Amino acid sequence: MSSKETIPMHQRSQNVAELLTVLMDINKINGGDSTTAEKMKVHAKSFEAALFEKSSSKEEYQKTMKSKIDAMRSTRDKRKRESVGSASMMANLGQDGTNNNNNNNNNNNNNLNMAASFMGGDMFGRNQSPAQNSNANTNLNTNVGPGVNGPNGNDGTANPQMFMNQQAQARQQAAARQLKNRQMGGSSAQQQQLTQQQQQLLNQMRVAPIPKELLQRIPNLPPGVTTWEQVTALAQQNRLSAQDMSIAKDIYKIHQQYLIKAKLQQQQQRQQQQRQQGNPDVNNNMAGSNNNNNNNLPMAQQQMQQRQQQQQQSQQQQNRNPNQRHNVLSQINQMFTADEQRALLQEAMEACKNFQKTHFGGQMSDANKQAFIKKFINSKALKKLEAMRMAQGGNNNANLNKGQADMLQRQQANMQMNQQQQRAAQNQRRGPVMNDAVSQGYNNQMNSAADSTMNNSNQPMNIGNNGVNMIPNQSQQQQQTNRPKEQTPQQPQQRIQSNRSVPMLNPTPEDVEVVRRISAEAAKTQLRLTDLTNSLTPQERDEIKKRLQKNQQLFAQVSSYAPQVYLFTKSESFLKEVLQLRIFIKEILEKCSKGIYVVKLDTVDKLVIKYQKYWESMKIQLLRRQQLLQQQQQQQQQGMDPNRAQNSQQQQQQNQANMQQARNRKPTKNQTTPAIAASVAMNMNDKGASMSPALQKAGSAVPNFAQQMSPNMTPGTIPPTNVLSPHSQSHIPMVSPTMAKAASAAALKNDTASSSRRGSTKPRGKSTAPVTGKKTSNAPTPQVVPATVPSTTNLSAAGTPNIRNKSATPLTAGLSPKSTIRSNSNTALASAKTPSPMTVSIPQPGNSSVFKKEEEYLSKLQLRKEEIRFRQKQRLDILSSSPVDLFLTTVADCLGINDEEIELINKIPETTADNINNTGKKKLTKAAQKLRDKEILNVSIQVGEKDKLIMSSKAPDKVMDYSISAMSLAAVFKNLSSTGSLNNIALSGSNATTSKDIGNIYSHTGGVKRKFDEVEISPNSNGSPSASIMSESKKIKIDSPEDMFVTHSSEAAKGTNNSSLMDSGKEGSCKSMAGSATEVNDTSIWDWNFWTSIE
């Protein structure tokens, strides 16, 4: 046996050419167009390639190819003979109809072409006389076209397009003869009254919309013409040529045949249902009795009725044996197009791969694979066939005037089903695509496996359609069979359906297996993360930390509820993607907690947006599930308790409104709507919609960091997004540069960095209200009292722990009054929230307008402070190459000069100007543009002869005054020397002052670590020292810049007011009170009037 590789390429090309020649002949007989011919070329090449791959030897390849070509040739010859015979039969029948039209004494009226000519003559030619119909008991059942299921119905390869072309050609010839005979004897023909059924059909034809497929074949029709009545009006107006009229008449007859056949089938189905209800035994003798009644019918009509009887008998056998599986692979080529077949084959192969992984551990024989694919495709074909049957059965009692837009589609499906039944009996030929993928062997052991796989992959829950669309094929057959017998009340049926759909909400073993498998696959994901720490600026690192920390619970929610969403969506791709992202997020969080950054800021933004979209869609699915449960409960309560059913309906309407709100809302932030979250959580807890233990066990195959972050969160409830467990924040250290820590049980965290990024934060009015009572906790919270009493201040600088001095300390220079007020306000608010037995709750006024003026003033001060910081940062970045411009613009800010009036001395580099104005070749990325949009000022550079740096405010008033008092500005330049030249200006005695300050501030321990002295907590505390207040971890290095804000107790006791700590200038305000004649009393900082008196 020679190898198939020895076959030369020219021989293979010759085989393709021979096969293509036969296919082209068949296409020409069928009346196909050039598009079909191009598809034939592709099919021929695909068939030869598949056959070559499938063949094991050269002899097998040649033998199979020869047999296939011979079979195709025989089919072509047979098609030619049938086409000629059909044309001649139609011509003869048309001639008989013409003779009957000319003879008024002929009582035989069983030919359908005569009825068609009646309708066509009355429709298109009012002056033409139809033939006399003296047979009063003629039934419409005899008016069946001989070509509807004529000789072409016996061919296993015919299609509806070829059938329509043949019938149109035959009827056109018959109509031409009839038209000629009528023109010859039209004056002598007598008008005949139509029967009631024919008149009804004629009226229906006048108003019925012409199907789109037929309407396109009529040339020169103006737009808007959709009925035959409109076409007739055009003909009477002579707007259609004779050729157009001839084509329109042929199309009219085809449309008429469709309506007649549809009505005939409906009538036969009603008769069949009546016989089944009356006496089931009559069905066994139905073929014989019907044959006795058809002795006087033409041969074509008898053949058609015999085929319909066979179809009915086969359907009855299927109804008696609903569990029996039929092999309809022989009809694949007629049920699916070539593209659909390829897609179906690809889907079957994917399902086979998944089944192989889950049941055979990667090992599966070729025979089993082929049997599985064959079973999969056969089940698909059965489902499509059953769907067509249900569509046909559901339209039995429908009005013919309704649903006429899709009438042609249903009729084509019915015609296709009739031909498919005949081809199933012959089983002569299979599709060119499916025969090569499926072998002849059939393994019955794979049936249940293939069915379960298809049900899992191709039957998702359709929760939005008041039920779960997971009915198997056998159940559909039983419903179709028992449809006429379903005369019982609807209420028990609804209860049965609800009882059937309830178990479907619980996870099946297949669901658990899929979740476990996907979790295992996600755990094996290889992550290659690059350390980007050195390439990121400190600001970017802080921003990444804050965003990851802020969205931790969003990540946890999506990961926790993904298995539940999979239960009623069956979307494996969604579950796999979420689990893979969970591994990715977990790795990022672990690296970030160690100070290693593996992603950039724009990547974090993309992840957050993706998770927000996930959560929005998951909330909609959860609401749908809740709605389904309520519908089932409502169906069960109907007839028992009307009040409970009404309440259930109201709750269902509320859930629908919430779901619509969730759809319309854009996912901007990871915040769950309180109404939606509470509603879903309450209902899912009440109705037991939580995840089953089996699914929880399957989902725990991979470590779920979401459960660690929220240990109290159950799978059945939607957690609120504004609550984070203490353990969840342990993954990433707090990002805030300002942190107030206490040794008590309640830890107070104040993130000033996030508040500065958001803009203004309004302190609550109760921060200034008097507090009565006393706290015994160690929280560093001074109590606000209106009187002037000796107290110590707890002013914490940026990033330092709380610093306490035993003696009274004056107001630290460099700290603005608004900073002290905000610190005290936040501290008082935190003390009110701290659980303690000694805490006295502060009554909050019902009307918040009492401190509205103060709140607006503080908000304006906070906004001004943030803008000053931002302006100074922008000047440092843009004017770093020009110290003169940096100095002068800062002084101009302090003097309140507008930016547009300031002209820079040196030119700004072109690259810097293009980057700021975003006018260069390299545009900003989306992430960078988002960051720029979040900035509190609009920055731009006016390029000209003298450049200008413009920073406009986004505040509502658009104008902000950044000037400071003249006294404060003069204090900065108080100790200047050599003011004659700008290059020689210096601060006199600055070095000595710095040395003295350092000597006063730091202890003389030689640069070793030291511990702060323990002091009292608040002004009213007893001040008992405790060793637990400051641990060893709170020691500060001597070279720390934060020690600049600490005054040693021994030096503070002297009450020296000469040393002053000037502000670093980052705010640009330079608000230093050093050197002023007014000495600040330390007790006056608690007096509100003191701060309002400061300008």
UniProtKB/Swiss-Prot annotation:
Superkingdom of origin organism: Eukaryota
InterPro entries: Gal11_coact, KIX_dom_sf, MED15_KIX, Mediator_Med15_fun
Low complexity composition-biased segments: 99-113, 133-154, 166-178, 487-500, 633-662, 780-793
Subcellular location, principal: nucleus
Gene3D superfamilies named in the record: 1.10.287.2920, Coactivator CBP, KIX domain
Keywords: Activator, Nucleus, Transcription, Transcription regulation
Biological-process GO terms, alphabetical: regulation of transcription by RNA polymerase II; response to xenobiotic stimulus
Region: Disordered, residue numbers: 66-197, 265-323, 448-508, 633-672, 737-847, 1050-1075
Cellular localization per UniProt: Nucleus
CDD domains: gal11_coact (cd12191)
UniProt GO MF annotations: transcription coregulator activity
Compositional bias of kind Polar residues: 155-165, 448-473, 794-810, 817-847, 1050-1062
GO annotation, cellular component aspect: mediator complex
Biased composition (Basic and acidic residues): 66-83
Family the UniProt entry places it in: Belongs to the Mediator complex subunit 15 family.
Function: Component of the Mediator complex, a coactivator involved in regulated gene transcription of nearly all RNA polymerase II-dependent genes. Mediator functions as a bridge to convey information from gene-specific regulatory proteins to the basal RNA polymerase II transcription machinery. Mediator is recruited to promoters by direct interactions with regulatory proteins and serves as a scaffold for the assembly of a functional preinitiation complex with RNA polymerase II and the general transcription factors.
Assembly mode: Component of the Mediator complex.
Name of the featured protein: Mediator of RNA polymerase II transcription subunit 15
Species this protein is from: Candida glabrata (strain ATCC 2001 / BCRC 20586 / JCM 3761 / NBRC 0622 / NRRL Y-65 / CBS 138)
Encoding gene per record: GAL11
